[in-house]
Curated annotation (Swiss-Prot):
Organism: Influenza A virus (strain A/Hong Kong/5/1983 H3N2)
Example of a GO cellular component annotation carried by this entry: host cell mitochondrion
Single GO molecular function: RNA-directed RNA polymerase activity
InterPro entries membership: Flu_PB2_2nd (IPR049110), Flu_PB2_6th (IPR049114), Flu_PB2_C (IPR049115), Flu_PB2_CAP-bd (IPR048298), Flu_PB2_middle (IPR049111), Flu_PB2_N (IPR049106), INV_PB2 (IPR001591), PB2_helical (IPR049113)
Motif (Nuclear localization signal): 736-739
Gene Ontology biological process terms in this record: 7-methylguanosine mRNA capping; cap snatching; DNA-templated transcription; symbiont-mediated suppression of host cytoplasmic pattern recognition receptor signaling pathway via inhibition of MAVS activity; symbiont-mediated suppression of host gene expression; symbiont-mediated suppression of host mRNA transcription via inhibition of RNA polymerase II activity; viral RNA genome replication
Family, as annotated: Belongs to the influenza viruses PB2 family.
Protein role: Plays an essential role in transcription initiation and cap-stealing mechanism, in which cellular capped pre-mRNAs are used to generate primers for viral transcription. Recognizes and binds the 7-methylguanosine-containing cap of the target pre-RNA which is subsequently cleaved after 10-13 nucleotides by the viral protein PA. Plays a role in the initiation of the viral genome replication and modulates the activity of the ribonucleoprotein (RNP) complex.
Keywords annotated in UniProt: Cap snatching, Eukaryotic host gene expression shutoff by virus, Eukaryotic host transcription shutoff by virus, Host gene expression shutoff by virus, Host mitochondrion, Host nucleus, Host-virus interaction, Inhibition of host innate immune response by virus, Inhibition of host MAVS by virus, Inhibition of host RLR pathway by virus, Inhibition of host RNA polymerase II by virus, mRNA capping, mRNA processing, Viral immunoevasion, Viral transcription, Virion
Transmembrane segments: none
Pfam family, one: Flu_PB2_2nd
Localization per Swiss-Prot or TrEMBL: Virion; Host nucleus; Host mitochondrion
Marked site (Mammalian adaptation) residue numbers: 627
Protein name: Polymerase basic protein 2
Length: 759
């Protein structure tokens, strides 16, 4: 109070006023502080000060011709004094009002296109529904979130090139538009923005919003996709939340969601194949998500999820240096450790070999529904502070931390044998064995852990073995906190390596990820995922396997036909027939295979019994390891639609139906494509016509390489010899004639010669 009186006193003296208003500020440090850099140091003061001025705005000189000096009320709209330091005019805020009411009206067609992100947002909010407000403590944790709904996923550099090309096409400077998405967007935007009068700089800003993902590290409780983040200020306060359902989806969220589902499916499938890494790469390269190649999305999309990161690692991309265990992302915040193999005994006296981390370390653990801070020493949990949405989530985090601590009392709490296996029926490593065991039932673990008295600390409570909170006692070292633990904020990416079993390691050899860490949660993708790889056929069930197998044979018929004649074993071992085996009843697989292989051999031996439709129909059955038996079959059973259905060896059935007139094949009533039969099946002697210009020398001669199809013969040079596959699946050696004159006689002699060469 005294100070205020003193100030008032001072201000009443005219000398004080004069000093404060007239003296220049000439202390360099102060001038520097307020004038260096383009960043405004005190925005609210600046705003108040500007608005108190008569002419806070500057404008181009042309304004004087377009806006009158005074408005209807006689107020001055701009000053005759020009702005110090530039040749611009100083303008009153009233001029803006005048312009908005009386200024020229331009064509508005481009506004929705340029300001698309805003128009879309208005639509989403218009159709969204806001529910009731609930008052409760909000556990928010900072996460890196996408704050810009509806964007493409271009890198900053790619976007810059697109923007320059669209907005400033005549500017100098090399611009290379390479990716599919860059070219499509550029073409589309150039068409949309023809004759656009909106300032190019504004257009460039708005384009950037549409093309680039912008992320911020924000405190969030609840939905993290961009359509929830855009209304964060409406849905989450410090002590309240408002329910909200967005009024529309945006492609970038759909891509993120579908990418995670595709990656999980692919990693799960690859893990059970003979060569997981090769299979994973094959699937990533042959999969499309919403019409875009998955590998292109992986290169651009920063989503961090276990399966997605495994796919990125396989492609040689950098990923985050944090590691995953039990569905939690661990990031070491301090300390260090060395690893040493150690043998330990479980409560069931089973020996486990574990890699012990020796040394003191601190970690943050971030999961979907719980977060924690973990401090541990060698095989000892020092402290765990955990927070989560509910009791279940908190328990999950505690189990993971207890197992991760490698404490002896945890290992001794194992009851029964540990023999968990992964999808490929291989035993899990010891740490995951322990994790699975306690995730199933943690009662003994919590009971054996030990209890301690606790001091009361603000915002923290103890937790008892039955997961009830307590202010007096708690499981040793474990506390539940009201505050969440922030996600790791850095976007740093590190180089990693991946082995053929999909274990991802950093450069020090620490395992960051493995297929065991991939979530088993099933979801429905929002964008269409097209898996072209045969490994993924089974994802849509038995019918899809059946249709896809036959479609594959038809698409590749030319090469399949040659292999069928010459290298059947290689053909039977093709991975494309693998999924089909799961449809054939196990007990009879081998006999079917033996029967079909014998039948095929007879076709090869006996002239003129080559039957395209029958070969295609029975081929997948020959892929199983054959059992020799005398059994003959008139039909073969496949398990689809929940029961056994029959494929007739000779003739059509609902499963496999070939219409000779239309040449269409239908599988289970679904169109499977057109099947062109071999010409010789209907007309004999065609091969002689095809072989005009060639001399048939005799039986196949292996020295001249694999058999060519008749279509490939045209590439031969005159006098060159080659094996060629003719109608019935037989192979003969031919030579391209040196002279054209004798071509006519070829067709007569060819037929005789073929018969002789074969027999």
């Amino acid at each position: 109070m005294e100070r205020i009186k003193e100030l008032r006193n001072l201000m009443s003296q005219s000398r004080t006023r004069e000093i404060l208003t007239k003296t220049t500020v000439d202390h360099m440090a102060i001038i520097k502080k307020y004038t260096s850099g383009r960043q405004e140091k005190n925005p609210s003061l600046r705003m108040k000060w500007m608005m108190a001025m008569k002419y806070p705005i500057t404008a181009d000189k042309r304004i004087t011709e377009m806006v009158p000096e005074r408005n209807e009320q006689g107020q001055t709209l701009w000053s005759k004094m020009s702005d110090a330091g530039s040749d611009r005019v100083m303008v009153s805020p009233l001029a803006v009002t005048w312009w908005n009411r009386n200024g020229p009206v331009t064509n508005t067609v481009h506004y929705p296109k340029v300001y698309k992100t805003y128009f879309d947002k208005v639509e989403r909010l218009k159709h969204g529904t806001f529910g009731p407000v609930h008052f409760r403590n909000q556990v928010k944790i900072r996460r890196r979130v996408d704050i810009n709904p509806g964007h493409a996923d271009l890198s900053a550099k790619e976007a810059q090139d697109v923007i320059m090309e669209v907005v400033f096409p005549n500017e100098v400077g090399a611009r290379i538009l390479t990716s599919e998405s860059q070219l499509t967007i550029t073409k589309e935007k150039k068409e949309e923005l023809q004759d656009c009068k909106i300032s190019p700089l504004m257009v460039a800003y708005m384009l950037e919003r549409e093309l680039v993902r912008k992320t911020r590290f924000l405190p969030v409780a609840g939905g993290t996709s961009s359509i929830y983040i855009e209304v964060l200020h409406l849905t989450q306060g410090t002590c309240w939340e408002q329910m909200y359902t967005p009024g529309g989806e945006v492609r970038n969220d759909d891509v993120d969601q579908s990418l995670i589902i595709a990656a999980r499916n692919i990693v799960r499938r690859a893990a059970v194949s003979a060569d997981p890494l090769a299979s994973l790469l094959e699937m990533c390269h042959s999969t499309q998500i919403g019409g875009t190649r998955m590998v292109d999305i992986l290169r651009q999309n920063p989503t961090e999820e276990q399966a997605v990161d495994i796919c990125k690692a396989a492609m040689g991309l950098r990923i985050s240096s944090s590691f995953s265990f039990g569905g939690f992302t661990f990031k070491r915040t301090s300390g260090s450790s060395i690893k040493r193999e150690e043998e330990v005994l479980t409560g069931n006296l089973q020996t486990l070999k574990i890699r012990v981390h020796e040394g003191y370390e601190e970690f943050t653990m971030v999961g979907k529904r719980a977060t924690a801070i973990l401090r541990k020493a060698t095989r000892r949990l020092v402290q765990l502070i955990v927070s989560g949405r509910d009791e279940q989530s908190i328990a999950e985090a505690i189990i993971v931390a207890m197992v991760f601590s490698q404490e002896d009392c945890m290992i001794k709490a194992v009851r029964g044998d540990l023999n968990f296996v992964n999808r490929a029926n291989q035993r899990l490593n010891p740490m995951h064995q322990l994790l699975r065991h306690f995730q199933k039932d943690a009662k003994v673990l919590f009971q054996n852990w030990g209890i301690e008295h606790i001091d009361s600390v603000m915002g923290m409570v103890g937790v008892l073995p039955d997961m009830t909170p307590s202010t007096e006692m708690s499981m040793r070292g474990i506390r539940v906190s009201k505050m969440g633990v922030d996600e790791y904020s850095s976007t740093e990416r590190v180089v990693v390596s991946i082995d053929r079993f999909l274990r991802v390691r950093d450069q020090r050899g620490n395992v960051l990820l493995s297929p065991e860490e991939v979530s088993e949660t099933q979801g429905t993708e929002r964008l269409t995922i097209t898996y072209s790889s045969s490994m993924m056929w089974e994802i849509n069930g038995p019918e899809s396997v059946l249709v896809n197998t036959y479609q594959w044979i038809i698409r590749n018929w030319e090469t399949v036909k040659i292999q069928w004649s010459h290298n059947p074993t290689m053909l039977y071992n093709k991975m494309e027939f693998e999924p089909f085996q799961s449809l054939v009843p196990k007990a009879i697989r081998g006999q079917y295979s033996g029967f079909v292989r014998t039948l095929f051999q007879q076709m090869r031996d006996v002239l003129g019994t080559f039957d395209t439709t029958q070969i295609i129909k029975l081929l997948p059955f020959a892929a199983a390891p054959p059992k020799q038996s005398r059994m003959q079959f008139s039909s073969l059973t496949v398990n689809v639609r929940g029961s056994g259905m029959r494929i007739l060896v000779r003739g059509n059935s609902p499963v496999f139906n070939y219409n000779k007139t239309t040449k269409r094949l239908t599988i289970l009533g679904k169109d499977a494509g057109t099947l062109i039969e071999d010409p010789d099946e209907s007309t004999s002697g065609v091969e002689s016509a095809v072989l005009r210009g060639f001399l048939i020398l005799g039986k196949e001669d292996r020295r001249y390489g694999p058999a060519l199809s008749i279509n490939e013969l045209s590439n031969l040079a005159k006098g060159e010899k080659a094996n060629v596959l003719i109608g019935q699946g037989d192979v003969v050696l031919v030579m391209k004639r040196k002279r054209d004159s004798s071509i006519l006689t070829d067709s007569q002699t060819a037929t005789k010669r073929i018969r002789m060469a074969i027999n």
